[in-house]
Amino acid sequence: MIYKIIDIPKINNTKGNIGVIENDTIPFDVKRVYYLFDVPSGAKRGGHAHKNLKQVLIAISGSFDVVLKDGKSKEIITLNRPDKGLLIENNIWRELENFSSGSVCLVLASEEFSEEDYIRSYKEYLHFVK
């Protein structure tokens, strides 16, 4: 398996539930947080790997599919619950697709942005992971 699902602690309340992410929820120090929203119908995001950075993706609203490849195997994971996070380790190719209308993908990253950490060509990625 080239990924791990993380349970996000949830506080149930009749007025609305609360998802709680604290230091021990995520297996790394979070150095950057961003989110994807208003993704047009049929659009894909991702299409890259990271040499060092790790991420947790959470479907805060709606749903989307995450296609993960490690050069040998391929997994497709549907995210559609705000109390489940998808841990993606470094050196894993990822593509996000099939975004539902109004979906929001929250990303927690282990590192700040660095273009040098990206592998943006799948051919280059396959060479890198050999």
Question: Which functions belong to the PLM regions below?
Answer:
Residues M1-K84, S101-G102, V107-L108, F113-K130:
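Non-catalytic, conserved peripheral segments adjacent to functional cores
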Residues R81-G85, N91-E97:
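Well-ordered alpha/beta subsegment
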